[in-house]
Amino acid sequence: MKNKLILAFSGNDIFSGGGLHADLATYTVNGLHGFVAVTCLTTMTDKGFEVIPVEEEVFAQQLASLKDVPFSAIKIGLLPNLEIAEHALAFVKQHADIPVVLDPVLVCKENHDLEVSALREEIIKFFPHVSIITPNLAEAQLLTQKEIKSLEDMQAAAKELYDLGAKHVVIKGGNRLSKERAVDVYYDGQDFEIMESPVLASNNTGAGCTFASSIASQLLLGKSPLAAVQFSKDFVYRAIQRSDQYGVVQYEK
C-alpha cells in the first residue's frame, strides 16, 4: 500500500485563501500528510498584490531537505521564476514513478512578456514528466499562444497541449465562456469530457489550487485521471459554496 505523503510546490498566500494553505487543507481533508516546498511569498501593498520569489538557494535547500522523503504524489503550483522552475523540474524528474499534477500558474505574470515567455518554455518542459496539467482558460491561451473564445477553441487548445507532451489535460473555463455555467474540458489523447456546473457568486480564491491538489490526492488514493478530475470538480464546487471573504473552504464548517 502506498504511503500518504504528498508534496506541493506552492507559494504562501498572505490571506491564506490559496497557495500552500489551500494545498495543505485539501491534503488534510483527504487524510494525507502534506509537505510544502515554498516557492514564493505574497504581500498586499499600496501598489497591489505582489509576488516575492524565495531565493534560488533557499528553494534548492528545501528540495535537498526532502530528497529522502518517500512521496506518493506531487502537486506543482506557482513557480515564480525560471530558476525556481528549473529546480522543481529536476526534482520531478527524480520522481517519475508517482502521480504529478501541474497547475501552470502564469496569469499573475501576464504583464511581464519576456519573463512569461521564458517561464512558458520551461513549464512546457514539465509536460512529459507529469500526469495531468490543469491550466485555466487564460493560462491555456498563454501556453498555446492562441485566443480561446468557444468550447471548440478549448478542445483545440487541450489537444495542442496534449501534443506538446501532456498526458492528460484539463482546461478550466470557469465563467469566461458562460456567465451561468462553469465549463471545463478534459482530454486524454483520445476522448474529450465536457464537465459543467452552475457558476457561483461566492469567492473562488484558491479554487485552482484546491482543484489541482484534490486531483493529486485522488490519484494517490487510486482513482483514474478522469475520475480524479470529476471528483475534484465537485469537491471544489462545494468548497466555493463554503467560501469566506478570504477564499474557498475545503472542510465542513
Report residues per predicted region:
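Short, small-residue alpha-helix embedded
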Residues: 141-142, 201-225
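Conserved N-terminal subdomain of the carbohydrate kinase-like
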Residues: 2-8, 20-107
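Charged C-terminal helix
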Residues: 53, 226-253
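Phosphate-handling active-site elements
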Residues: 31-33, 192-193, 218-232
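Short beta-strands and strand-loop turn motifs
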Residues: 8, 73-76, 101-108, 134-143, ...
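Short pre-catalytic strand/loop immediately N-terminal to key active-site residues, enriched for Gly-Thr
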Residues: 10-15, 192-205
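Conserved phosphate/ATP/ADP-binding segment of small-molecule kinases
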Residues: 116-191
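Acidic-glycine-rich active-site phosphate/pyrophosphate-binding loop
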Residues: 1-3, 8, 19, 179-194
